[in-house]
Amino acid sequence: MWSGQPQQDEGLPVGLSAIPVPWKNLGPSKSNRESSGGLVEASTSWEEAQGEEHPAPAPLDVSRLRSSSMEIREKGSEFLKEELYKAQKELKLKDEECERLCKVRAQLEQELEELTASLFEEAHKMVREANMKQATSEKQLKEAWGKIDMLQAEVTALKTLVITSTPASPNRELHPQLLSPTKAGPRKGHSRQKSTSSSLCPVVCPTAGHIPTPDKEGKEVDTTLFAEFQAWRASPTLDKSCPFLERVYREDVGPCLDFTVQELSALVRTAVEDNTLTIEPVASQTLPAVKVPTVECNNTNTCALSGLARTCHHRIRLGDSDSHYYISPSSRARITAVCNFFTYIRYIQQGLVRQDAEPMFWEIMRLRKGMSLAKLGFFPQEA
């Protein structure tokens, strides 16, 4: 039963049912149209009421959003710049470290190269010095052997000279010191001498082949020669240009070594000056024949220097050559005289002679006398 209040429609929302709407009892079609129009109006009024009770949210602040975005972008840019700066700084440090290591490497390579070069140079220098010392030692050894051979030959010649110059029974008339005391002097009161030839023979008629030599010889120093010798002795040298040796070469050495075979004579002279000449005695067995540049020397009966037919008891060898040349006693005496002179002046040059100037001068004069006598053909007899 209707009580005069409109009832709430269960199919409508609460808001619309709560709104009081006047109802009119119209026809069926007209009432339906009026009811639908009323519903639309009620819905519109409900929305307005809802709008008044709950207002719509305000629009977003665009400028604020833009500022936040800009701030974020700037912070990101600054962060990236810092990272880029750090990376560039690290890269620069690494480049500097690489450059420093490259310099160290180049310096080490240069030092290693210099050290290697210095080591090779030092090793080459040591090898060169060792070779020079070895060559010098070998040369000195050869010279020593040459001197030994020469001295042995001289000793042999001196022994031969002593043996041949000492008779088995000495002549007591020529050596008064060998006489007995009763016969040493003349008897008292004896005024006559026998005129027989036998008593005068020791003085007037010396034995054949023996020339008596005086017991004493007069000596006088030539001032020119002595001055030249003193000048040479102040600084001994083997240079032929100095006045002292130039005179000896011109007056003694040159003539003494001037043999018939000129080519071999020049070789002998060079070997004597270089101290490379060797004189060897000829063995009893047959020796191989040796040819001389200008004179054939097929046996020991021809002198290679003079070309004369002489019995050769010695032979010479020049330097390291294997060739031997047979020489006569006269040629050997001439070569030996020159070798004795050169040996003595070498001893003076080396400081081995400890004498005053005058004894040394007279020894040189004696050696020059030996060269002159050998050139003139005087030489000791061989055994």
UniProtKB/Swiss-Prot annotation:
Gene Ontology biological process: muscle cell differentiation; protein transport
Residues modified to Phosphoserine: 169, 180
Gene Ontology MF annotations: guanyl-nucleotide exchange factor activity
Region (Disordered): 1-64, 167-200
Coiled-coil regions listed: 77-128
Domain of life: Eukaryota
Function: Guanine nucleotide exchange factor (GEF) which may activate RAB3A, a GTPase that regulates synaptic vesicle exocytosis. Promotes the exchange of GDP to GTP, converting inactive GDP-bound Rab proteins into their active GTP-bound form. May also activate RAB8A and RAB8B.
Name of the protein described by the UniProt record: Guanine nucleotide exchange factor for Rab-3A
Annotated source species: Mus musculus
